[in-house]
Amino acid sequence: MNLMNKFLLFFPKYLIKLFLIINFIGIPSISFAENEMGVSTFMYHRFGEDRYPTTSVTKEQFQSHIKYIIENNIDVISLEEIISKLENDEKFNEKSIAFSVDDAYLSFFEYAWPIFKKYKIPVTLFVSTDIIDSNTAGYMSWSQIKQFIDEGGSIGQHTSTHLHMPLNSKKYVKEDLLNSHKSFMKNIGFVPKLFAYPYGETSLAIIELLKELNINHAFGQHSGVISSHENHYYLPRFSLNENFGTSDRFEFAVNSFPLQIDQFSPEDM
């Protein structure tokens, strides 16, 4: 049996199974976001750290990503521009992408940041403050973070201890966030407005806490394209590592379009 015949034989069966699974577990009702191109936002952690393939892209992969957007004249915007459009209820009529990096690993500062800077590509670094305060090897220092800001980089909050937010009490999480605010004020003189959930995890209670602390937008780690219909407290990002940082996957994500979630059940975890 050739490949096409196998596909025709087995695909309908898998389609039926997928339909049954979706109806059973309550996957959200989805439609295309009308007349919007959207923003594909990417998330990196490490660069060229082969010991950590689940959180690192190879240098060759990163170079291929940059080469693709330069050669194809892809519009790259900052996370602040995304937030501005969301706050003003503007549609994303032009196809764009955006870049972010979590955790402030030294490989970002030493390898990736010079490349972002060379091509004037905006990028936001989400920082968990405790690991920086402790001068841990393999992470950036506050001096390097300040240099990154001075050279045009953008900073975001990522909690103090990189905790699993929904698994802890509201009181504990609030204390953690306030500790990170104190560290930011001490070391860079301001508290960043942008926020990203460690591990991409949140809950309705956590979102309410962010609102109490005047954090108005937050990014997760789930794949998807941002549109004007997006939940401001659960903005999607395409996560990139060795397995999911191939040229094919990156180019597919760059050229993806937004889907509008009309109904989501259950509402909380």
Model feature map: region roles:
Residues E80-E87, V127-T129, A196-E201, H222-V225:
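Short, solvent-exposed turn/loop segments enriched in Gly/Ser/Thr/Pro and often Arg
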Residues M1-F11:
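N-terminal secretory signal peptides that target proteins for export/translocation
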Residues M37, F42-Y52, N93-I97, Y105-A205, ...:
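Metal-dependent polysaccharide deacetylase catalytic core of the NodB/CE4 family, i.e.
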Residues L213-H222:
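Catalytic-core region of carbohydrate-active enzymes that cleave or remodel glycosidic bonds
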